[in-house]
Amino acid sequence: MRKITAVLMALALALSLFACGGVPVQDETPGSDIQQGTVILPKPQEDNEGGDSHNGEYPSAQDPLPQKPGDTKKPEEPDKAEDGKNPGKNEDNAQTPAEDPKQEENNNNNNGDNATTPSDTKVPSGEYRAVWISYLELGGMLTGKTAGQFRSNIGAAYDNVKNLGCNTVIVHVRPFGDALYDSDYFPSSYLITGTEGDNLPFDPLKIMVEEAHNRGLTFEAWLNPYRVRARTGKALCSDNPAQKYINSGSDAVYQTANGGIFYNPGSREAIDLIVNGVREIVRNYDVDAIHFDDYFYATTDSSIDSALYAANGGGKSLAAWRRQNVNTMVREVYAAVKAEKQSVRFGISPQGNTKANYDTLYADVATWLGNAGYVDYICPQIYYGFNNATCPYSSVLKEFNGMIKVSGIDLYVGLAAYKIGNEDTYAGTSGKYEWQQNSDLLSRMVTEARGARHYKGYCLYSYSSVIMPASGVKAQVQAELTALSKIL
């Protein structure tokens, strides 16, 4: 009966996520340059680790969504998929969110939190304009290269970003429980030499920060805190802490049915490792921000932490306890960042489906945005068109804007540039062809977001989608970028 129930829950969730737009998958056959002055770099590295850098609508690691040709975003990674609201006492003694994700929004319709009127849509001063550069794109620039070659490649990528009118780069530095920098906690990434744990021939992060700052770009270090492997992939090196935990039978990691390996949010050892790893980056490198992706719990399977829950659940439901674990990590990371350098910011990019965030990834976004001491900004992946049947852009924008209840938290909107020119398979009949039939969606989305009270900027996913688009969508990508440039 338990298996039948689990299957039914997975099917229901999958249908919900499909309706919200699917998951973006990195295009591995980029076309030629899209605009004069664009520098062409090596094509994105083939993904051998279980999906692309982002995951907007993630069901369960045990029941991955079937991937369809042309669909975007990886089902393997638990990237952005949480939030809703929890009735009753909040597990962290923080502000109690409303039960219905829409309720909090509706309760605040008169306080200006959700205002998006045309009169408010002027260009904000210092607007944040960012691009995500994932490990897939870094692989082609970095693997097997000399320090000089990598410096040239990443510099060219940054020049391309600046040509888009952007001022910020969000670059992967720990995609899989590894390090693209000199670390005392995590092994060097296979992206550097091709083998995890090799001695560093040079320090990629040092170069990435220097080249960004040389161009006046803000540099954000992008980490996936829990993910070690999203599915069966490259072997872990013997010095990888996750491998040591596996060898010892520790509950600091868990493995999923599809071969994924993740740090266990309920483990004190795992939390300390994540926090220390962030502290190390902020202390040793001149990064401007720490950026977490949407990978939190990779599965709803109760067996992955049953012993920890029995020992530490404290009478909470499993779901409430899991949300508390993630909240604890987020709060401690924020404190560690500020203790090292008050000026460094900490933000998270959850997926746009707030119910999936809350119920499946156990990411309590409402608590993060309703209380001080969790984040400096939120950048939801609002990877939906205006006509999406279940999660229309405007509604999701208002929902996240309305969640922010304390001053000092900024709202950035993550936009699905990877969908330009493609069929939005799971957007429903009303939104299925929206990204093919329009060439001004990005500009309209930014214009509308500027009317939201807490809005401060946007981020495009992904670098290769706008700089090296497939030949079949190249003209439409250029049209979208031209329309966007007119409102900057």
Task: List each model region and its residues.
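Aromatic- and glycine-enriched glycan-recognition loops and surfaces
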Residues: 145-164, 191-215, 276, 324-329
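Substrate-binding cleft of secreted/luminal carbohydrate-active enzymes
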Residues: 372-392, 399-488
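Catalytic domains of carbohydrate-active enzymes, especially glycoside hydrolases
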Residues: 152-179, 284-289, 373-377, 455-456
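Ser/Thr/Gly/Pro-rich low-complexity, disordered linker/stalk segments of secreted
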Residues: 28-122
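Aromatic-lined carbohydrate-binding/catalytic grooves of carbohydrate-active enzymes
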Residues: 164-200
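C-terminal motif of bacterial Sec signal peptides marking the signal peptidase cleavage site
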Residues: 16-19
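Polysaccharide-binding and catalytic clefts of secreted carbohydrate-active enzymes
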Residues: 150, 167, 206, 242, ...
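Active-site-adjacent "subsite" loops/lids of carbohydrate-active enzymes
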Residues: 122-151, 220-221, 226-284, 429-434
